[in-house]
Design a protein with these regions (language model features):
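Outer-membrane beta-barrel proteins
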Residues: 1-355
Length: 355
C-alpha cells in the first residue's frame, strides 16, 4: 500500500480516537460522485464518472485560556471513481496535489485566534480572492461548478504560489466581525522557489459584509511582480425568502490572462449573474456569464471571449445527502486556451453525502 495512503489513514484514525476523548477534534468529509456527459464541437464526446473533489479530513481546537485558542485543519481529496490515478481529464484542478495515488492535499493549516483580534493561519489555504466567491455558487465542487464553465475565472482554481485559488506557504489573517456584519481578510504567500531567481511574494486582500439577506464582497490579488500581475473582483448576493439573486465581476489586470494562456496582456474580464429558488427540499438555479478578449501588450487583441450559462437543481434527502443535476453550455468565439471554436456542453448527474 502506498506510504502516503498509510500515513493519511493513520492520521484520520488517530483523529477519530482523539475525538472520543476530546469533543474539539472532528473527523469530517464530503463524498461526491457524478456521471458527466461532455460534448465539444470539433473535439471528443465522452461520458465519465468523476469524484468532484471528494475529501476526508480532521480539524480541531484547543482552548489556551484568556480568550486564546489554537486550531488546525488537515484535509485530503480522494478520487473515489479511480483512486489509483490522478484526476481525470474532466477535472479542472489537476494541480490540487500530486495525484500519484488518488490522494491530494487540500486545506492544511494551523493557527491561533483570539476574541476581539481575529485569527492568524499558517499553511495552505484559500486566498482572499477565492474564498468569498465560492458562496455565490450553488454547485460548488461539482463538475459544473462556476470556475469550470467560465462563470468565474481561473484564479479560483489550482494550488501554488502564483495566484492560484489555494495558496501554499501562506499566512492568512481574518478579522472578527465588526460594524454589524463586516470582515476584512488577507493572505501573504512566501516565494519558496529559489530556482526561479525571483523574489515575488503574492498577496491578496478582501472585505465582506453579511447582514440580513445581503452578502457582499470585494477582493484583490497580485503576484507582486509588477506589470500585468493582478486582478480585482466584486460580488453581491441578495436572499429574499425562498429566492436568491447574485452577481459578480472580475477585472483582469493581467493575472487572469497569464493563468489561462502564455500571452502578455490584460482585459480578460469575467462576469456572471444568477438566481435560485427553493421549494421545500428542492432548489433550482440559473446562471449566465461572459468572458472578454485579451488586450495584448504589443497592441491588438486575442479573441478569448465567450458566453456561458448553467441550469441546475438539487433535492435534499436530508441535511447531509442530496442528488443534483446540472447542464452548462459555453460558447467560444475562437479556438483558444485549449478549446475549439464552438460549444462545450456538459450534463452532470450526481450524489453527495456530507459527514
Amino acid at each position: 500500500m502506498n506510504k502516503k495512503l498509510i500515513v493519511t489513514a493513520m492520521g484520520v484514525a488517530l483523529a477519530a480516537g482523539m475525538g472520543m476523548a476530546n469533543a474539539d477534534v472532528k473527523v469530517y468529509g464530503q463524498l461526491d460522485l457524478s456521471i458527466d456527459a461532455v460534448d465539444v464541437d470539433g473535439g471528443s464526446d465522452d461520458v465519465n464518472m468523476n469524484s468532484n473533489r471528494s475529501a476526508v479530513g480532521f480539524k480541531g481546537t484547543e482552548d489556551l485560556g484568556g480568550g486564546l485558542k489554537a486550531f488546525f485543519k488537515v484535509e485530503y481529496q480522494t478520487d473515489m471513481d479511480d483512486a489509483g490515478t490522478a484526476a481525470g481529464p474532466l477535472e479542472d484542478d489537476t494541480n490540487e496535489g500530486d495525484g500519484k495515488d488518488g490522494w491530494k492535499s487540500r486545506d492544511q493549516y494551523i493557527g491561533l485566534k483570539m476574541e476581539g483580534f481575529g485569527k492568524l493561519t499558517f499553511g495552505m489555504m484559500s486566498t482572499a480572492y477565492k474564498s468569498p466567491a465560492s458562496k455565490l455558487d450553488p454547485f460548488y465542487r461539482t463538475r459544473n461548478q462556476s470556475r469550470n464553465v467560465g462563470l468565474q475565472s481561473s484564479l479560483h482554481k489550482g494550488r501554488g504560489e502564483e495566484g492560484q485559488g489555494r495558496a501554499t506557504n501562506t499566512v492568512r489573517y481574518d478579522s472578527p466581525t465588526f460594524a454589524g456584519g463586516a470582515k476584512v481578510f488577507g493572505t501573504y504567500t512566501l516565494d519558496n522557489s529559489e530556482a526561479d531567481g525571483e523574489n515575488d511574494d503574492p498577496y491578496s486582500v478582501g472585505a465582506s459584509y453579511k447582514a440580513g439577506g445581503i452578502y457582499a464582497f470585494a477582493s484583490y490579488i497580485t503576484t507582486d511582480r509588477g506589470g500585468n500581475d493582478d486582478a480585482t473582483q466584486f460580488g453581491i448576493k441578495y436572499t429574499m425568502g425562498d429566492a436568491a439573486f447574485w452577481g459578480m465581476y472580475e477585472i483582469d489586470g493581467g493575472l487572469i490572462t497569464s493563468t489561462s494562456n502564455p500571452n502578455l496582456g490584460d482585459g480578460a474580464d469575467v462576469f456572471n449573474v444568477g438566481a435560485s429558488y427553493t421549494i421545500g427540499n428542492n432548489l433550482v438555479s440559473f446562471d449566465y456569464g461572459e468572458g472578454d478578449d485579451v488586450d495584448l501588450d504589443g497592441g491588438g487583441t486575442l479573441n478569448t471571449s465567450y458566453t456561458t450559462w448553467r441550469l441546475g437543481g438539487y433535492h435534499k434527502f436530508s441535511n447531509r445527502t442530496r442528488v443534483y443535476a446540472t447542464f452548462s453550455e459555453q460558447d467560444f468565439d475562437a479556438a483558444v486556451a485549449g478549446h475549439n471554436k464552438g460549444e462545450q456542453d456538459i450534463f452532470s448527474v450526481g450524489l453527495r453525502h456530507n459527514f
